[in-house]
Curated annotation (Swiss-Prot):
Keyword Endoplasmic reticulum among record annotations: no
Protein name as catalogued: Lipid-A-disaccharide synthase
Cellular component terms (Gene Ontology): membrane
Enzyme class: transferase
The family this protein is said to belong to: Belongs to the LpxB family.
Lineage, opening ranks: Bacteria, Pseudomonadati, Myxococcota, Myxococcia, Myxococcales
Length: 383
């Protein structure tokens, strides 16, 4: 009797874990006999994927931040390659984390394993030369942004635009009051959402200034609810400890970041996938980010686009403010939040821009279309 097709899945971010889990579910809906193993987080585990390594071990960003972790990251890379050599997967699905996954793709190519890459590296923004590596190592690039497919096809990469998985991960639009009721929050209190990221490095670098900004805004708005969605990669104490002595008591919600934004009057969001999720909730937001100086200057030299947030990149203009590096101060954060807190031209202009951005992301069904494309890579006789 022939063994069922086996698929290697590798995700390294909280968002990637979510996207990968939805793709696994879509694959299982079509082929219940498929088996999966690899690296990921809680959501892939909940889908029954056999996890050989925890995604949190490779979830780091920046040159100085990654250096201490290199030995362990290389060990995991070797472990996944050895597992692939032993188990002989019929296809591999690599999600995000390009510095890790492209190295793994090279090893998989040597083993003859077809590679589908889900959530493209942002090579159109920086390090464009990597498209040659992708052409050599990736059998199918599954694009989630509308302009990526043409970019890759012009470079000779087999690519398919499947749509943004974020579109179906966020709840349907509703009033802030309705979302507050769902989350058990006070319906009438002014509400500020803080989304500091899903990596520990982001919590350390970003949350203290977010807390200080929230303290200033709390002094101006009695009864302000400060709500923080807790990523599965972060321990609760890492959040609460950074509020100690601030006079602000955060309300922590397990996951449910889009709903937290939906419940807010405004949100402060770490640059990344969460910005797109927050924008789809049609609430005013301020994008913030800070990395080490070395990482920042290297990034400045290599960056080919004017913005860092996907909202502004998709719009081709500044829809939401981006406070980066030295501009990310409690004073500036509070100032930008005040500007869009109450009805008026700045708030309405931002909301209009967010609505336009939503229209460019297409319809739901990204995981379904991605699953169809992955199944096309199964070897003859395994389909």
């Amino acid at each position: 009797m022939t063994n069922p097709p086996r698929i290697l899945v590798v995700a390294g971010e909280a968002s990637g874990d979510t996207h990968a889990a939805e793709l696994v579910a879509a694959l299982r809906a079509r082929r219940p006999d498929l088996t999966f193993f690899g690296m990921g987080g809680a959501r892939l585990a909940a889908q029954g994927v056999e996890l050989l390594f925890d995604a949190r071990e490779v979830s780091v960003m920046g040159i100085t931040e990654v250096l201490p972790r290199i030995p362990r990251i290389l060990q995991i890379l070797k472990g996944l390659a050895e597992a692939a050599a032993e188990r002989k997967p019929d296809v591999a699905i690599l999600v995000d984390i390009p510095d890790f996954n492209l190295r793994l793709a090279k090893k998989l190519k040597a083993l003859g394993v077809p590679v589908a890459y889900y959530v493209s590296p942002m090579i159109w923004a920086w390090r464009r030369g990597r498209v040659r590596t992708i052409k050599r190592l990736v059998d199918r690039m599954l694009c989630i942004l509308p302009f990526e497919e043409d970019f890759y096809r012009e470079a000779g990469v087999s690519a398919r635009y499947v749509g943004s998985p974020v579109v179906e991960q966020v709840p349907s639009p509703d009033t802030a009051t309705a979302f507050r009721e769902r989350l058990g929050l006070s319906k009438d209190a002014p509400t500020l959402a803080l989304l500091p990221g899903s990596r520990m490095g982001e919590i350390r670098r970003l949350l203290p200034d977010m807390v200080e900004a929230a303290k200033r805004l709390s002094a101006e708005r009695p009864g302000l609810q400060v709500v923080v969605p807790l990523a599965p990669t972060i321990d609760r104490e890492e959040i609460t400890s950074r509020f100690e002595g601030s006079g602000v008591t955060p309300i922590l919600v397990e996951g449910r970041a889009p709903e937290v934004v939906g419940a807010s009057d405004a949100a402060v969001v770490a640059s990344g996938t969460a910005v797109l999720e927050a924008g789809l909730m049609q609430r005013p937001l301020v994008v913030v980010y800070r990395v080490s100086l070395i990482t920042y200057w290297v990034g400045r030299l290599m960056l080919k686009v004017a913005f860092v947030s996907l909202i502004n990149l998709l719009a081709g203009r500044r829809v939401v403010p981006e406070l980066l590096q030295g501009e990310m101060t409690p004073e500036r954060i509070a100032e930008e939040v005040r500007r869009v807190w109450i009805p008026g031209a700045p708030r309405e202009e931002m909301l209009q821009g967010l609505a336009e951005m939503r229209g460019r992301l297409g319809e739901t069904g990204a995981a379904t279309r991605a699953a169809e494309s992955v199944l096309e890579l199964l070897p003859p006789g395994r389909v």
